[in-house]
């Protein structure tokens, strides 16, 4: 296996207007400080304050949003990164791995990847994702793209329907239909950063949020060697060329991951498991005492000095003693969080170091906290209790169903833009209003200028005399609608749906 040299991975160049020449340690750090500023000040980060973590449309400010969750992930990611660097320093391996002058950028990339990790999520979280994908599947039927004879194809869009004697074009149609019907928050995050917001981040910083390496248009089985890394779509057809360049700049083999992404993933796993349980107590879904009993019984066999006793049991006993006369709830979660971090962060850091050859190559086919250890079992305990007692709660399920209906309803409302012919839509884009299409004109005016410009820019570069043009134009039109609706906050989507459905406020 090739030698480990992080100078080949922490690439501080950018796609546009990249810094030139050899840089000192301080100059490289300033480049990544610029990334921090671009990210923290971006509208995509601000919108996270009104996007769901677990409880949609929550008015209680003590319950987490995507933004407060992401800030917590950022802190845990920083903790893991510092732990890794500290251990490598103790082993005198920083210089060997090319990290002696890159500790600052190493930490910064991890922190900002953590802060950005959810920016592509649509309103209402995973139910928003499901609503988008279900809506498009009902119209494009990507599963029929493999059907024989071609007359069985139920796709309602004529330009995307398979045709006899057009095998090359049919391959593109299959690819486009598969891609459109696999909206995914991580892939949308890549699209936001590069295509929609043009943040022009360093290659290394963008590599930190490429969590999954399967393209959204992938059909068929994935290789066993990358089964975990490719379990979800990681980027769209619209960003295919950009990702190809990213791989080249970061020296990533096909379907491999950037090394620091494993740290971001571990920080997310640690953060949300405890946070979801704390939010459930805040929402009075169960009490701290009930939560402790749920955790106790779900753990199974108990032994003295087990990981459960050292983490959960210790937090429970200290909160009950409550010598400071503080809230039992606050005390329990403070101790639970501290105990969990003190056990899992060092373990995640050591797992990173122990598996560094595979991680550096981007081929480590599992999460840092996904193994047969007690630490992994502890995380699974938190997740299982949340699934059984939080996510299945009637109040949560009702809000999720409402969110699903809101997103589906908004897509129904904007569907006329997808029904226009190529020539009619092109004319609408050029003139912005057409008398013969009053509804479509008003809907088009409501779309974000940023999203409309992204559509115009890419479609204007397509050769109009090519047989592929109608297929690709429709693809980017679908992206335009998905970009707009997925970029809404929960509250904006809810209000927009009610306004357009003429429901009383």
UniProtKB/Swiss-Prot annotation:
Needed cofactors: Mg(2+)
Keywords tagged on the record: Hydrolase, Magnesium
One Gene Ontology term from the biological process aspect of the record: dGTP catabolic process
The keyword Aminoacyl-tRNA synthetase is assigned to this record: no
UniProt xrefs under SUPFAM superfamilies: HD-domain/PDEase-like
GO molecular function, one term: magnesium ion binding
Signal sequence extent: none
EC top class, as a word: hydrolase
E.C. number(s) listed in UniProt: 3.1.5.1
Binding partners and assembly: Homotetramer.
Function: dGTPase preferentially hydrolyzes dGTP over the other canonical NTPs.
Family per similarity comment: Belongs to the dGTPase family. Type 1 subfamily.
Protein name: Deoxyguanosinetriphosphate triphosphohydrolase
Species in which this protein is naturally found: Salmonella gallinarum (strain 287/91 / NCTC 13346)
């Amino acid at each position: 296996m090739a030698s480990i040299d992080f100078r080949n991975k922490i690439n501080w160049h950018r796609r546009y207007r990249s810094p030139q020449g050899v840089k000192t340690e301080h100059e490289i750090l300033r480049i990544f400080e610029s990334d921090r500023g671009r990210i923290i000040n971006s509208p995509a980060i601000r919108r996270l304050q009104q996007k769901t973590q677990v409880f949609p449309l929550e008015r209680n400010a003590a319950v987490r949003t995507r933004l407060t969750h992401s800030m917590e992930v950022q802190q845990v990611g920083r903790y893991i990164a510092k732990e890794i660097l500290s251990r490598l320093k103790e082993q005198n391996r920083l210089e060997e791995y090319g990290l002696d002058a890159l500790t600052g950028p190493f930490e910064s990339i991890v922190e900002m990847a953590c802060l950005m990790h959810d920016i592509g999520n649509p309103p209402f979280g995973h139910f928003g994702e499901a609503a988008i994908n279900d809506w498009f599947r009902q119209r494009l039927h990507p599963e029929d793209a493999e059907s024989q004879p071609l007359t069985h194809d139920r796709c309602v869009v004529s330009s995307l329907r398979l045709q006899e004697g057009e095998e090359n074009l049919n391959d593109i149609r299959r690819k486009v239909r598969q891609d459109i019907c696999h909206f995914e928050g991580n892939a949308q995050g890549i699209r936001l950063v590069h295509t929609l917001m043009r943040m022009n981040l360093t290659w290394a910083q963008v590599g930190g949020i490429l969590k999954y390496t399967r393209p959204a248009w992938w059909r068929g089985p994935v290789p066993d060697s990358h089964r975990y890394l490719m379990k979800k779509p990681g980027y769209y057809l619209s960003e295919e060329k950009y990702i190809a360049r990213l791989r080249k700049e970061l020296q990533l083999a096909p379907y491999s991951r950037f090394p620091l992404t494993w740290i971001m993933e571990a920080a997310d796993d640690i953060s949300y498991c405890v946070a979801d349980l704390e939010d459930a107590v805040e929402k009075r879904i169960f009490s701290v005492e009930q939560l402790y009993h749920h955790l106790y019984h779900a753990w199974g066999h108990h032994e003295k000095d087990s990981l459960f006793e050292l983490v959960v049991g210790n937090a429970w006993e200290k909160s009950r003693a409550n010598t400071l006369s503080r809230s039992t709830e606050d005390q329990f979660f403070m101790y639970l969080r501290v105990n969990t971090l003190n056990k899992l962060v060092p373990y995640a850091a050591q797992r990173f170091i122990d598996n560094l050859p595979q991680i550096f190559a981007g081929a480590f086919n599992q999460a840092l906290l996904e193994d047969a250890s007690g630490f992994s079992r502890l995380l699974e305990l938190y997740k299982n209790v949340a699934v059984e007692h939080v996510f299945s709660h009637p109040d949560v399920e009702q809000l999720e169903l409402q969110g699903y209906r809101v997103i589906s309803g908004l897509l129904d409302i904007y569907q006329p833009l997808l029904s226009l012919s190529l020539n009619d839509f092109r004319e609408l884009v050029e003139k912005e209003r057409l008398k013969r299409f009053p509804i479509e004109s008003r809907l088009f005016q409501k779309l974000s200028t940023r999203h409309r410009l992204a559509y115009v820019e890419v479609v204007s570069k397509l050769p109009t005399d090519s047989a592929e043009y109608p297929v690709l134009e429709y693809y980017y039109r679908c992206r335009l609608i998905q970009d707009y609706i997925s970029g809404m906050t929960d509250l904006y989507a809810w209000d927009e749906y009610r306004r357009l459905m003429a429901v009383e406020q």
